[in-house]
């Protein structure tokens, strides 16, 4: 695309997505999650957005985890999070949990966004991650961009930093 200066630039683009709310209160500062096990070091590594804001989770017991309670309606919800393994954690299993619904996968060597969609029953229950599961004391994993939203698919990441009720991105 020729510009005024005659230099071709990359193709302009827009992200067209519906309005969504990230219901997680602390999507990057995971150490602030209300229910957790393990040691959490915020701003430990470079995240997928290119800044120093990924959290390192270190196993101090069998299964490190973090959870937040969410008030659900009887509709579809999608959880998503970016995960990157360190050392011996690569290839171990982790679980994304929405209430009693569990998605299991393996911890990758490179940053990967994992997504899990499920229809929930109405009520208040937890959303969380157990990583790795099972763990050995000292296992380390990087996490970033923890998101839970109403909808049958994940949209682009919506950062939150302690806002009660989450953050809404307009359409």
Please describe what each predicted stretch is.
Residues 1-171:
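Extracellular and organelle-lumenal recognition/adhesion modules and their flexible linkers in secreted
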